[in-house]
């Protein structure tokens, strides 16, 4: 398994009602399955609170989902599959802060695996609400192809969406050059 350190008992916990920061992750596979996740961030901990996981979603349906969440929560950004041009245009037109998904599947998987491990307080940095059933199912079945050693590109949409979000949050934001400090 790609995430063999995922354990239901450890990682599946009810999400809190509120968060310090709120993000949406989106793996948009066009006519294939789309995974949209509502993520709460508290300190360094990421908590997937809700999910929509469906094949054949129109962009208008994706937008309806994200806009409904935005009426409930102050969404800081939507981390989107970098290849999903059309939905990114719709999100920007609606005023959302659109963040391209980071590149590098293997490096991203390493980051997610590290954050599934126990943190300094003994708890993992990634938690999943029990309502996110598709994400849980994918985490328990996402595997490497024994012939290629690469992740199998099937039933991986929630895992990809999670990876985009987690890697974005794990990537330090470059600081502007400060001339006053010279």
Question: Where do the language-model regions lie?
Answer:
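Generic detector of well-ordered alpha-helical packing
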Residues: 28-29, 82, 157
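Residue-level detector of short, conserved catalytic/binding motifs and their immediate flanks
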Residues: 34, 76, 159
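Short beta-strand scaffold segments in enzyme catalytic cores
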Residues: 34-40, 163
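Stable alpha-helical structural segments in soluble proteins, enriched in small hydrophobic residues
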Residues: 157-169
